[in-house]
Amino acid sequence: MIKNLKQKIKNRFSYSLLSEDDNTDYFSKPCPEDNATLWQRFTFGWTERMLMTGYFNGPLEMKDVSDLPDRNKVNITAPFLDTIDYNSKYPLIKQIYKEFVSRNKISVATKIFVAIVSILSPLCLKYFIYYIKLDESQKTFKFGFLLCVLLFLSSLSLTLSQQYGYWFGLQTSLHARGAITQKIFEKTLRLSNQAKRLYNSGTIMNIISVDVGTFSDFFWNNHIEIFVFPFQILALLILLCWIVGLSGLVGFGVMVVSIPLCTFLSTKIAKNLRISLGYADTRCNLTSEFINGIRFLKLYAWEQLFLDRIEEQRTLQLKYLYRRAIYWILDRMITQVTSALVLVATFSTYALTGNQMTLEVAFTAMTIFVNLRRPLEMLPEAIHRALSLIPSSKRIENFLQSPEIQDQPFLEQYSNNKLSIRNNNNNNNNVSSTSSIASSASSNELFDVKINNGTFDWNEIDDLDSGMIINDVRGFAISSDINDMDEMILGDEKVGKSNDTNNGIEYDGAVQPSSSSYVLNNINFIAPAGKLTVICGIVGSGKTSLVSGLIGEIYRVSGSVNIPNNISFTTQQPFLLSTSLRDNILFGKPMNMERYKKVIDACCLTPDLLQLAAKDLTEIGERGINLSGGQKQRISLARALYSDSDCFILDEPLSAVDPEVASHLFDHCIQGMMKDKTRILVTHQLQFIPSADHIIVVDNGVLTQGTYSELKEKGIDFESIMKTKKLNIDENDQSSTSTTDKKSSTSSSSSELKKSTSLLNSTKELDINTIISEKNDPNLIEKAKLLVKEDRNEGEVGFEVYRQYFRHGSLNLFFLTCALYFISQIIFQLSDFWLTIWTNDETNQHDDKYYILYYCIFIGAFIVFLVVRYFMMASITFAASKKLHSELLNSVAFASCQFFDTNPSGRILNRFSKDISDIDLILMENFSDVLQCGSTVVVALFMMIYITPLISIPFAILVVVYYVIQKLYRASSVELKRMESITRSPVFSLLAEAYNGLVTIRCYQQQKRFIEMMQNHININLRLFFYSFSVHRWVGIRLEFITALIVFFTAFSSLFSSNTGFSVLAVTTALGICSYLNWTIRQMTELEVKMNSVERVESYIKTPREGIRHTSEFEDEIDIDGEIEMDFTKWPSRGEVEFKNVEIKYRPTADPSLKNISFKINAKDHIGVVGRTGAGKSTVGISLFRMVECSKGSIFIDGVDISKVGLHELRDALGIVPQDPFIFSGSIRMNIDPFNKYTDDEIWTALEKVKLKDAISSMPLKLESGVQENGDGLSFGQKQLLCLSRTILKNSKVVLMDEATSGIDYVTAALLKQTIDENFNDCTMLTIAHRLDTIIDSTKIAVIDKGELVEYDTPMNLIKTEGSRFKKLVKYQTDFYEESQKKF
């Protein structure tokens, strides 16, 4: 029968879903609440279809959840926060009350109704007791039954009104949560450089996860209760005085004493929370930097350095969180002890003043106290949350008022062809005004790009006036003539015409310019319309500052800028989204297939698409992690080209590609499809200067501009610069011959290797239609996926998750704590029994003092167990929290690179921010509430059955109904909450990506698109939160009805009981557990939801490690040359490297990136690695560091298979200057020598060799001066110089130079090459380069093509070999330079 009923229900509720096509757009399904009947709205029956689907059809999926009601969508709610008055006190809180709470008056009404019913229900009990005490002759069944119904209705009304209060409060919570998150994201898109130094992506994520969460928690319930509860408490106390007379004032006095204590404790709780959040911000900042720079940390074997820094902040955070927990425990103790002491004080005073304790007095008063308990317990909680809201509000307000980019156009255009500009003139208000950057609307008529009398600085004017700059080091500028490298002074570009470095202002170790010294001072600039303007200059001369001034990314102190409205900009370190290659090129523009194909061809991407599994639909990892540097630059260039703007500003777009590809890009892009447009090219590759219509040389912030002949008259000697680049084959022939004679035994003839023709030439005739399809192929798209879906467990949170959590604390101690909760509740229930015995003592067998004494003993014992259980719970949860974070951090730190390729940083940071925050702040309270409420309900139910066994029959039926309801509920509620947690990750991921690409997003005016993307992500997350809360109310209403029935059956059974006192106790207990039963289920579900955070953290803790970290952990000893043990502190001693049949795949299912590579490098050889961009050169280099493991073959260093060496020892033994240098926040010393291994003299010597000593020595704190995350403000070349100084200092026997000078001008590169030759002469060195002049004198050259080693020999032999690919590259570059010199 039950089986048939189940099948009928399944058919009834699942037929429509079974008939739907899998591709149905469920997001477009309207919210079922919109079309619900009045009864369905009243009972939340409109959620049942979803609940049945989750129970009968398996775990809920996103497609099973309907749309969010329009009233709750963020695009509707966010505009209400546009008019915040920041001049008032607590402006954000006031705005939410004004805009959201005032529109939700029914929420206020329900809270008032709850207060009124809580006063009426004790009166119903009073009259019921009067009836019970009547003689049988005076009782009438109808009147008794009527009183039972009244008790049922009063109980039901009280609990149902609480449920509706929660529901209507949810609307305000959703509005606040969505609107604030959206406003934070919109503000992020407008942050100035100063604001970015104060708020990195980790800080902003922490604000959203913690502070916005505080608003969400407060405004779903506490925002009205904090005002209603005091009046409710006062009304109940008046009623108490009416029942027990002036004795009630004694109880009131106890409460009055407790209120300031609770308020004081709540203040302490908020203070410690505020301090802990500050450390949490720092921890999240460091974690964000750690994740963003993880590959560099692994290459340098610096993981432990950052782990220690993060753990230091974590320890400080936990210190204040533990203090907060102590104050919270004291607050809860005082609250619960007060409720007990009020009973003791009131009843003792009442009895000792000569009054007779009767049933109606004692239990009516007890019911009043039961109704008082919730507001009494929740008022301090509400006050605590309100006080916690203040620091969160302040943090959000500070962020929303942080400085904005000075010249930020709105998306709306005006008829006068000007754009409205948002200009942040002060820190209090964002004022709309018209900027002096004139942006002309797009038209067919081009105009000159100009800067008129422009003065620019990286700091806002307020900072310059006040002299206070926080942690700002803009880098190091080399100040000299273009051929003079002797003079160097501070400031990437942070210098004007003055060379006085002592007029700056010192703060936090950095020298800042005074108001009379700027990055660019009173400059005039012109880029002729429709012409090519080339900007050149040595590293740190001010080129990036000039470009930033053009696009409005640097503070303009004075002057004006005239630039077209629609510009395209490519950064030196390209910004790529974690989406398909195609979407990165389109960048929000509609697809024009004809133009798209031309762009692909012009940017020389066709050969690269051939190598990608899904061609242009291939998913690009975060920051283009699965692409080479050249591929990333060309995709960025393709995006600019496809946008078809009036003006193109290109910052070093050709530095990471080989000469042949660079020429192709220059001819087909810059001089091809961009022809007749205004082009501004920043480049170190001076061979392109002859093609320029206008040239600008930047030197120490000073601009010299004109045509080539005009600049030559001014003393700019381009010819001498070009001579440093020319490849003299004859000289190299001689040097190579000498080298070959010495090492002829190690060379292998190129004739023994495969020959290769130019991949570029071989694809020219290829039909691009075979590569790019106009229709999206689902199979290709699925094949192109790089990011994995976020893990999501199904079903209830398993016992193993709980066991693992308490294993981190103490499992045995937890069981003891559970026992203490039940023991303390039994003791408290015994006090009620004792009170019943007291009131039933009509013969006065004992005086009142006797009963008072034992009543106090029960209450005292309850208090003792209360204190112990709370402190034990705090000890367990804090130990677990500390251990979970530590294990999570270590697991992520030592995970493989593939883990970071397939999981965006925002998703990972979500574990460290929101999930850890839930574990830190909520789990202790959740476990405490569940155990307290659960023990109260269990003990009370057993007591009621013991007193009135008759109710066990209806109880059994209600238990079955209760079981069915909670099974239906939990099957869906947990899944909804899991999906809600998962849908938070895209919010954080988009925020992280947008933050990293702010310059690109703003230049392409893509703010509106990104805002809409964020709105979509937030709405999806709110949608899950909305339905999760809705099913809470569905189960809540049904459980409240069950508890009301329990009251009815208990009261009805009491009509037939002979023991009046215990019958009244049973009814009173039933009334008391009404709210507790529902609160127990709610807290159990909330606990299960929050345990999902533990589940998510545990899933990352189980992440496979990349390999054995220390050699000592290997089971087998390494046998090398007959020796069993090795001293790896001195390995490698020679530097001999050998690749044997090496094959490398980045993913098991991917095609090999390197195929059967075999070659040997003798000790002290310098090997040049060349090849087309994307050919696999960098893969050869990083394979030495085991950043990706060999799928076949082996690599040996000094005869040792590196797969048998611990990763730490291996990477620590090698040196590297990476292609994309990364600078970490901290001091200069920390970035060069993080473990304090070297003396100051050694560090200064290394800095002198890379031409940075003068710059750093001019800083007041010198080596202790600070730099920002990723070296913001340093030019690309300056970062490379710092990385080079690390490697020189390390003095490894094997060194990898991966495009180590790609961001440096040729003069500096020539000097550094001399430095490299001098300092690495005794090392084995692999140099990956596109600049052939940097590797032409190498011992041997390895040519890589399509992942294969196609040539490997001395430069002389390769040049002599007909058809050699290397010879073609050399001849191509040499001919190009000679042709360029002829043009000069």
UniProtKB/Swiss-Prot annotation:
GO molecular-function term, one example from the UniProt record: ABC-type transporter activity
ABC transporter domain span: 505-724, 1137-1371
InterPro entries named among the record's database cross-references: AAA+_ATPase, ABC1_TM_dom, ABC1_TM_sf, ABC_transporter-like_ATP-bd, ABC_transporter-like_CS, ABC_transporter_C-like, ABCC_6TM_D1, ABCC_6TM_D2
Keywords of the record: ATP-binding, Membrane, Nucleotide-binding, Repeat, Transmembrane, Transmembrane helix, Transport
Binding of ATP, residues: 537-544, 1171-1178
Record-stated family: Belongs to the ABC transporter superfamily. ABCC family. Conjugate transporter (TC 3.A.1.208) subfamily.
Descriptive protein name: ABC transporter C family member 2
Gene behind this protein: abcC2
